[in-house]
Amino acid sequence: MSLSPWGAVQRGDPESRLHGRAAPGAARPPMVVLGPHPNPAEAAEFSCVNLGDSVRVSLMLTPRGRGPFGEQLQEILVKAKAILRQQGAPMTVTFQTVFLRDAADQPECERILGTHFGADLPVTNYVLQPPCCGAAVTFEAWAIGGDSVRVERFGPQALAVAYDSIRWVYCGGLQPGAAPVGAYAQMTSLLERMRAALSGAATDFEHVVRTWFYLGGITEPEGARQRYMEMNRARADFYREISFGRSLLEADVLHGTYPASTGIGMRGTGLVGGCLALQTRREDAVLIHLENPQQTPAYAYHSRYSPQSPRFSRGMSLVLGDYITTWISGTASIVNSESRHGGDIQRQTEQTIDNIERLMGPENFAAHGLRSVGATLQDLAKVRVYVKRQEDFLKCKAICERRFGRVPTIYAVADVCRPELLVEIEGVAFSPCAPPARRRSA
């Protein structure tokens, strides 16, 4: 299956391609429905997103027991299976991230997941980030179901999902080869493997909308620089030859700059990566990269933050039919380009959530050319919270629960890219809009 990227949408003011929207402030039904939880005070363990002819389910699961590793993982899998059986259509788990407390548990984890899923094993990232709750493992997954959904596998590290004239490609579990030493060489090797995985699934980097990079020792020195800076240098060099959205311009459509992304620490000295790519022929597709009006774009940072600035957008939104999907990059307590509220986890958490709220709010969408659309914190289908220090977990969690409500959330201990930053948050939101105008056929 070969599809042209993003969709054929006319270039120019994106507002001109949307019509018939409800007036600002008009009531709209929520797209994201939160699942129940045994404890109503806790965040939901899953959310469902109805996309018309398909349903997506976001699973964010933590075991209640604290027994042996295998028992904790089996508890999660039993719970996931029960949730997916409740849906109105057969569901396929496509992409999952497993957060591990101990690297020694990964072989057992791989064995159990291999037995559980068999030939239907999803693309999987294994990340050495201890769950803040004290469990040995937590589990995030996306599942999809629907009459038109088709799943195609390209080995353990790439999978494609097609429905409604859209094709998504998930790549994950990617690591550098054995030879590379140092963050620059590790990142270069990983990106080459990511390119190969995308190619094997009949797509390429120009279609990528979201990336994740988990770097061991992210703030540790490496020569005269920090490992994160070296990772950024490699990414900038690799991306230099990639025209993100180039084929969009050839198709006379709107394009973005860099994908939304998370670059976060993990235990050890390794590197794990994954990405999401999008292909479609649909004429009503509009892709927009989002920047925060109160933050300097990461790719425009001063060289004092990194010799080569981080190449990612603060967020990426896809307007498709009557809904918008917004991927929120890893976000921290940064205003303009400077860290705020050093040493104060509560104020950093509030600032981080303020940044997310502002990024996907209607005013920012209007500034990007789309009026009367946007998302709120209640439109989030799931959230990940990375906490630098275990002792800050409960203070951070209390603020997240107050601001996010019952949105499914996983908390993991992970170093953030700057020593003074104590928390980083990412998420995905789905919000409604009226159908965009379709382009006249040639």
Model feature map: region roles:
Residues S2-A442:
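Short, polar/acidic, helix-capping and beta-turn segments at strand->helix junctions
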